Amino acid sequence: MKAPFTSLAGFRAVFETLPQVDAEAVEAATARNETLTKPKGALGRLEDLAIWYAGWIGDGRPALERPQVAIFAGNHGIAARGVSAFPPEVTVQMVANYRAGGAAVNQLCHVAGASMTVTELELDRPTLDFTVSPAMTEDELVAALAAGWEAVDDESDLLVVGEMGIGNTTAAAAIAAALFGGTAAEWTGRGSGVAGSALEAKTRVVAEGLERHGDALSDPLEVLRCLGGREIAAMAGAIARARVGRTPVILDGFICTSAAAVLHALTPSALDHAIAGHVSAEGAHPAALARIGKEPLLDLGMRLGEGTGAIVAINILRSAVACLSGMATFAEAGVSGG
């Protein structure tokens, strides 16, 4: 679907009339769940997940058949500041690896039965160093938001967004600090594996960016423009498109959560259609999830990004949906006690 906005004002307008969850589907799923051949509440959180999914799909007996994983790749000017354990050219190399089927995300998509798309966002033109100037112009931000919006498959019934971009945990840390408050050190973690003096340098870069753009950081979209990256903006655009289309979303790690947090800062109901797939080993991720009110499904010590933790959670949600829709009721099974 072509993005319905050509400016930041147009993107903001998207959030003025967001569709609501289908209350009738929630009611139907809840009623069905209470008649299934199990003690009440015996499936724990799976029951809540299935009812949540039913409400956004709009079907009291839903199916999960067409999950989409949308990966966005972008390069960052701050990568030249040595904030990552890997050089900037790795972004392009990893995109080639995705297309060849050789990355972890490819294997996990296969296991989860998910389609996978990869969107490259001007990899030959990194964003600007946000310690010197805004990372993006308004036009560049709008283009990235639109690219994310248009990458969403309208036929999908679940969306996961992932990212590739050397330096993007630095941008994510800066976004989180700007949106949530606190110091650069509180939000800056090891990312690709930096430690010691390299981690100190990364933290300084985040602090410099916050100081440089302090006057603009009361506006969430200005936070994204000044401190973010094209792939982070594209993730925000994709999550927004899913919200408008009432497509459920599983959020991934710290970078994805920072992108989602921009939407949450615009209006908290922007993330009603989203759950957190996991909590990553990136130290600030638990705090970021708490700030947007999301409880993770998994804690596996993952810190790869690229959507991987959320993809692992797809089959948990699929299991929940299968139980709601496929189990027999007490009456159907001829089992007493229902």
Swiss-Prot record:
Species whose genome carries this gene: Cereibacter sphaeroides (strain KD131 / KCTC 12085)
Signal peptide from the UniProt entry: none
Top EC class, one word: transferase
Pathway(s) served: Nucleoside biosynthesis; alpha-ribazole biosynthesis; alpha-ribazole from 5,6-dimethylbenzimidazole: step 1/2
Name the UniProt record assigns to this protein: Nicotinate-nucleotide--dimethylbenzimidazole phosphoribosyltransferase
Keyword Glycosyltransferase belongs to the record: yes
Family listed: Belongs to the CobT family.
Active-site residues, Swiss-Prot/TrEMBL: E306 (proton acceptor)
GO molecular function: nicotinate-nucleotide-dimethylbenzimidazole phosphoribosyltransferase activity
Record's catalysed reaction(s): 5,6-dimethylbenzimidazole + nicotinate beta-D-ribonucleotide = alpha-ribazole 5'-phosphate + nicotinate + H(+)
Matches recorded under InterPro entries: Nict_dMeBzImd_PRibTrfase (IPR003200), Nict_dMeBzImd_PRibTrfase_bact (IPR017846), Nict_dMeBzImd_PRibTrfase_N (IPR023195), Nict_dMeBzImd_PRibTrfase_sf (IPR036087)
GO biological process: cobalamin biosynthetic process
Keyword flag Secreted: no
Entry-linked HAMAP family: CobT
Entry's EC annotation: 2.4.2.21
Keywords: Cobalamin biosynthesis, Glycosyltransferase, Transferase
Superkingdom of origin organism: Bacteria
Gene assigned in the entry: cobT
Function statement: Catalyzes the synthesis of alpha-ribazole-5'-phosphate from nicotinate mononucleotide (NAMN) and 5,6-dimethylbenzimidazole (DMB).
